[in-house]
Amino acid sequence: MDRNDRRIARFTMLGHATFHLYELTIPLFVVVWLEAFDVSAAVLGTVVAVGYALIGIGALPSGALADSYGSKRLVVLSMAGMGGGFVLIAVAPSLPLLAVALVLWGAAASLYHPAGLSLITRGSERQGTVLAYHGVAGNVGTAVGPLVAALLLTFLDWRLVAGLFAVPAALAILVAGRLEFVERTATDPDESTATDADGLSAIVAQSRVLFVGSFLLVFAIAVLAGTYYRGLFTFLPDVLAGLPVFEPVEIAGETFEPSQYAYAGLLLVGAAGQYTGGRLSDSRSPERTIVAVFIALIVVSLSFPVVTSFGLFATVAICALLGFFVFMEAPIHQALIGEYVAADVQGLSFGYTYLGVFGIGAAGASIAGIALTYGGTALLFVALAALPTGGLVLATILLVRSRRPSP
């Protein structure tokens, strides 16, 4: 990587770590909220799904803004809004107001991915490698956030813990503000097509172009992956807490939940998956790689309820495999966008992608809650396995198309 690549990597690593620090800490709070607000998993899952949906709904305008005005300001604004959103969560006195706070958090979080990822695909020379480091940082956030939350929730009230989580965003903003880089490569157009026409009409025209090519398949793959991701992680802490091998342990008068640390460890293993997926995107066909990842996810998902009954070591192993492969997919489909979409509309394409991943994909939280409520863990993982199965079909079509000779 050259100097500009390294600075873009550092900047987006900060933003990505901040995003996932908050995003996957919320499921740990879900365990507490089930009791604090006296609601069922189905109801709370739907409330959380609404908040997560805003990440997707706001992604489309964020992508268009990134094409027109650049990414740096949007990423910094996103980090500030996410920190502020957790302050609002901390003071929410009822379930409806908690839902409002989650919506506001989701709106701020929606700014990150289209802005940050289009910065990488447009501004860096070694896109796959930068995406790999970007993904690793995201998984560090996903692991550190839940781990710190688990420790703090052991000793402190959940409202105080939520308020303290505003501090990481403030620190990230201070560091990010000191990084300077060139957002677009010299080979990109000086002006994006988003600035050549009136805003809405330009977006409509660009969207028509996007959805007549292979991007439609890439978009559908991302939607299925996002639904799987949200369905899995919203209630995974609750699923792990119900396993006999992770029964609570009392140490020095304090009760510790081993399942929370297993959850954090699973997310940390995901960093290796992100890095592997990103590096393979530079050296191998991303179409072939994503096919292999979906096959692995199907096998691991269907095996999970069975393998976790075989004891501690088997449970830890299947959790590690789950974490590795679910996160390996993300940098690969991001690289596919860089491959199939023109540079001047990549912000818009990432906007649509994360509208699908976090907007439509937010339904995964509700699906998971319903499956757990009415069918338990076995039904949950059967339902989840259907999603990478659909992704496998679409990815295979994309692979076949990519191998056809150009006319």
Where are these regions (language model features)?
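Extracytoplasmic gate region of multi-pass secondary transporters
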Residues: 26-27, 213-275
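Helix-breaking motifs and short loop linkers at transmembrane-helix boundaries and internal kinks
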Residues: 38, 70, 91-96, 108, ...
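Central cavity-lining transmembrane alpha-helices of secondary-active solute carriers
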Residues: 48-63, 261-276
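Conserved MFS/SLC helix-loop-helix module at the cytosolic interface between two early adjacent transmembrane helices
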Residues: 57-95
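Structural signature of the two symmetry-related core transmembrane helices
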Residues: 73-88, 288-303, 385
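Cytoplasmic helix-loop-helix junction between adjacent transmembrane helices
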Residues: 101-140
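Helix-loop-helix hairpin linking two adjacent transmembrane segments in secondary transporters
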Residues: 134-190
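A late C-terminal transmembrane helix in Major Facilitator Superfamily
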Residues: 338-377
